[in-house]
């Protein structure tokens, strides 16, 4: 399936039904009286997070989403039926922006979480509403209000706890393949990976942790050079970064500094994320040189530094243990800081007529 992580769409909520002019004409009600009902609410457009969706591909083919209009009022003070809400499923991790203001208006993270992106119009008032002492037989009613129309931009930010970063050909895809059941395309040339790859790594407790191999980080990535600007946002939600450095590269220290510079330039919390530096390709490198690079890096960072080989799986157990330790520590300090969440009732999106 093609991986699409951004889309632009239009959403149109339903128009409220018109109120009507009607009068009672029963034989046993000689005085008659206004009896025109109100129009029903227009349907709203509601996004719902769905854990089984992994891409915004569907939004490349359907770009306009319209909810049902409300029905007009009926005689005998009958309110028209409300239009049916349009429920649109999106992947968990979808961020919703208003294209006209560039404002973030919604962020759907949890399965089943919903967000109303366009509210249906209120139904118009029937002539019964305008009955007064001065006007006993009003012959006018109000039309329903138009529903909201919005131009939206959708961005998918992957929900992975661990992000694997590094320059092209550092061995990121090989590492995620060695750690999980993911089978990304692997090759000995830059930009083999053109989309983020996800893999689930089992912990000793049996729980699964999602790892993401982020492609395309080169110098200037934060400005859109290479593929970086498209994919840097996918590590915004990660809790820890594994920074892979190729020991066989011409200048591993410079490569490390390049990626760190891109994280600093991009911002949005990425420089503050905990990091574990993994010096990769130890199987093809010089152990003394690896020790030298380790000491040089210790002058630049306080992050944990390990030497590994994704190909021979050397050092991977230690790497995983370091990752689990960081995640456990973060979980412990945030246990009492998690915000309360609640499930919104779809019916609560409509305000009752007063």
From Swiss-Prot:
Family: Belongs to the TRAFAC class OBG-HflX-like GTPase superfamily. OBG GTPase family.
Keyword Secreted: no
GO molecular function, one term: magnesium ion binding
Any one GO BP annotation for this protein: ribosome biogenesis
Name of the protein in its database record: GTPase Obg
Boundaries of every Obg domain copy: 1-159
Keywords: Cytoplasm, GTP-binding, Hydrolase, Magnesium, Metal-binding, Nucleotide-binding
Binding annotation for Mg(2+): 173, 193
Gene3D superfamilies, per the entry: GTP1/OBG domain, P-loop containing nucleotide triphosphate hydrolases
């Amino acid at each position: 399936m093609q991986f699409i992580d951004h889309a632009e769409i239009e959403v149109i909520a339903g128009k409220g039904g018109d109120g009507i002019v009607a009068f009672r004409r029963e034989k046993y009600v000689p005085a008659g009286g206004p009896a025109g009902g109100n129009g029903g609410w227009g349907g709203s457009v509601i996004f719902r997070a769905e854990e089984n969706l992994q891409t915004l591909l569907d939004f490349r083919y359907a770009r306009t989403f319209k909810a049902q209009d409300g029905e007009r009022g009926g005689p005998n003070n009958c309110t028209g039926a409300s239009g049916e809400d349009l429920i649109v499923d999106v992947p968990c991790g979808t961020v919703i922006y208003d294209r006209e203001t560039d404002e973030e208006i919604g962020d759907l993270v949890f399965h089943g979480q919903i967000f109303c992106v366009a509210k249906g119009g209120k139904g118009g008032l029937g002539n019964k509403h305008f009955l007064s002492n001065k006007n006993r037989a009003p012959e006018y009613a109000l039309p329903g209000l138009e529903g909201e129309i919005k131009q939206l931009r959708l961005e998918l930010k992957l929900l992975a706890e661990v992000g694997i970063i590094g320059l092209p050909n550092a061995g990121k895809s090989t590492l995620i393949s060695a750690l999980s059941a993911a089978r990304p395309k692997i090759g000995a040339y830059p930009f083999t990976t053109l989309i983020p790859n996800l893999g689930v790594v089992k912990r000793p407790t049996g729980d699964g942790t999602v790892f993401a191999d982020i492609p395309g980080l080169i110098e200037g990535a934060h400005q859109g050079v290479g593929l970086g600007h498209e994919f840097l946002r996918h590590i915004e939600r990660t809790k820890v970064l594994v920074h892979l450095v190729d020991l066989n590269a011409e200048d591993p220290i410079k490569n490390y500094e390049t990626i760190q510079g891109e994280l600093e330039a991009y911002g949005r919390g990425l420089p503050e994320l905990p990091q574990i530096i993994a010096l990769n390709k130890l199987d093809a490198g010089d152990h003394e040189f690896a020790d030298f690079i380790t000491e040089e890096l210790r002058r630049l960072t306080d992050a944990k530094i390990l030497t590994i080989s994704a190909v021979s799986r050397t050092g991977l157990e230690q790497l995983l243990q370091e990752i689990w330790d960081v995640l456990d520590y973060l979980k412990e300090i945030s246990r009492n800081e998690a915000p309360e969440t609640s499930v919104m009732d779809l019916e609560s999106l409509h305000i009752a007529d007063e």
